Curated annotation (Swiss-Prot):
Transmembrane segments: none
Pathway(s) this gene product operates in, as recorded in its UniProt entry: Pyrimidine metabolism; UMP biosynthesis via salvage pathway; UMP from uracil: step 1/1
GO biological process: UMP salvage; uracil salvage
Keywords associated with the record: Allosteric enzyme, Glycosyltransferase, GTP-binding, Magnesium, Nucleotide-binding, Transferase
Catalyzed reactions: UMP + diphosphate = 5-phospho-alpha-D-ribose 1-diphosphate + uracil
Name this protein carries in UniProt: Uracil phosphoribosyltransferase
Binding site for 5-phospho-alpha-D-ribose 1-diphosphate: 78, 103, 130-138, 199
Activity regulation field: Allosterically activated by GTP.
Cofactor note: Binds 1 Mg(2+) ion per subunit. The magnesium is bound as Mg-PRPP.
Length: 210
């Protein structure tokens, strides 16, 4: 499985700022947006292109354009929405597919409660957006959903990832590419990433308990 930990100095600087527990909601949200743009830039570096001839100021000119159908972005509710503006700034024509999952209290497995996927997924690159890759359960369920709908080229973009989640993902979806700003140390007994970022959703939306 292709796993890319983006070591660009700007990415490392910004993920370090995100780890500050005293960072304001506004500051956290802005950094998540900026990191979304930077990580999406890395994740789209291997997209296929095709030649296209268009009018230029001195006559016809051959240029390169992204091949195939428009990319679809797949933010996982709710924290994934925080990354969406930054990625859309880079890929403004992208389609947006939104999924929401919650844990079944009996089986402890993630089950979908919201699903709005764009059409022709088999022709599109799908970029899953979620700040945290922890156990991998939610991500795996999202990929299962996308593949059932026809998606074939899937990448995941995360701010931080845990080794346990990466291992779980590789066991079932080794064809999925992962791009992250940091691979952290481990999960604690409650399944939280350490050192992590805290609850990214609460920090993005300002719903954490002060």
């Amino acid at each position: 499985m292709k796993i890319v930990e983006v070591r660009h100095p700007l990415v490392q600087h910004k993920i370090g700022l995100l780890r500050d527990a005293a960072l304001s909601t506004k500051g956290f949200r802005e950094l998540v947006t900026e990191l979304g743009t930077l990580l999406a830039y890395e994740a789209t570096a291997n997209l296929d292109t095709e030649s296209h001839v268009q009018p230029g100021w001195a006559g016809p000119v051959e240029v390169q354009r992204i091949a195939g159908a428009k990319i679809t972005l797949v933010p996982i509710l709710r924290a994934g929405l925080g990354m969406l503006p930054g990625v859309l700034a880079l890929i403004p024509a992208a389609r947006v597919s939104v999924v929401g999952l919650q844990r079944d209290e009996e089986t402890l497995q993630p089950v979908p409660y919201f699903e709005r996927l764009t059409g022709r997924l088999e022709e599109r690159d799908a970029l899953i957006l979620d700040p945290m890759l922890a156990t991998g359960g939610t991500l795996i369920a999202t990929i299962d959903m996308l593949k059932r709908a026809g998606a074939r080229r899937i990448k995941g973009i995360f701010l931080v990832a845990a080794p346990e989640g990466l291992k779980a993902l590789e066991a079932v979806h080794p064809d999925v590419e992962v791009y992250t700003a940091a691979i952290d140390d481990h999960l604690n007994e409650k399944g939280y990433i350490l050192p992590g970022l805290g609850d990214a959703g609460d920090r993005i939306f300002g719903t954490r308990v002060e």
